[in-house]
Amino acid sequence: MDFIRAIILGIIEGITEWLPISSTGHLIIADEFIRLNQSAAFKEMFDVVIQLGAILSVVVLYFHKLNPFNKLNPADKQKTPREIQLTWRLWLKVLIAALPAAIIGLPLNDWLDKHFYHFVPVAFMLIIYGVAFIVIERRWVPNHEFSVMDIDRLPYRAALYIGLFQVLSLLPGTSRSGATIVGALLIGVSREVAAEFTFFLGIPVMFGASFIKILHFFKNGNSLNLEQFGVLLVACLVAFGVSMIAIKFLTDYVKKHDFTFFGKYRIVLGIVLLIYAAFKAFLG
């Protein structure tokens, strides 16, 4: 039964990791109705490590763009020295953007999980950023031209600003992609570049978060049995496959549409969650 639940959770992760609607928020919601029959320690680790499947989809889809070494894949189109230089610069921008979340998130990770990993905080963050998306798209973007239309022209300073916005996503329900896209739009980065840079920024952030959770899991004396390994593997594989579709969808979507729809979705979901939380509290 846990393998079926793992498939469902993998689908949820694959869809919500890249759309600006909060994968963590959706997994918290899913846990209320689709609970794995596993220990609390495993479930805590599962919710983070499942992201590895999602992030591997970015590596596969954008391998040529992200790979600075021609010899890694001789069958791939060879890069010019200029293209290799741009790839190294892109990685430097990604690392610069990842630093704020690493510096601030590491010491606060356990405290944030303890105090904000619940329905009500998630609901409020869904609503707040939903409103932010709508206001930015309707009030800010129409009055400001995009100054960055190509990811290779993204300034290092802009990468740092986007990284600072990513810190806000440490609060469950915010959405890592949502926070970075909001920040990117506010500093004049086009929707396409904002989405693409968000994909790349997820690589060090999510690999790092997964490594820390795995380390924490074993450091606390837990062990991973064969069934748990299988559940985790199935969820990651499903998240990988679904993420491939979600990334393609979002890259095509932002070429013709803005993020208003996602803002409305977040607000509706947040309100439904608050009603559910109130109803649950009333029933005791």
From Swiss-Prot:
UniProt EC number: 3.6.1.27
Record localization: Cell membrane
Residue intervals passing through the bilayer: 7-27, 44-64, 90-110, 116-136, 167-187, 197-217, 229-249, 259-279
Membrane topology: Multi-pass membrane protein
Keyword Cell wall biogenesis/degradation: yes
Function as written in the Swiss-Prot or TrEMBL entry: Catalyzes the dephosphorylation of undecaprenyl diphosphate (UPP). Confers resistance to bacitracin.
Note in the entry: Bacitracin is thought to be involved in the inhibition of peptidoglycan synthesis by sequestering undecaprenyl diphosphate, thereby reducing the pool of lipid carrier available.
PANTHER family reported for this sequence: UNDECAPRENYL-DIPHOSPHATASE
UniProt-recorded name of the protein: Undecaprenyl-diphosphatase
Protein's organism: Lactococcus lactis subsp. cremoris (strain SK11)
Taxonomic lineage: Bacteria, Bacillati, Bacillota, Bacilli, Lactobacillales
Gene field: uppP
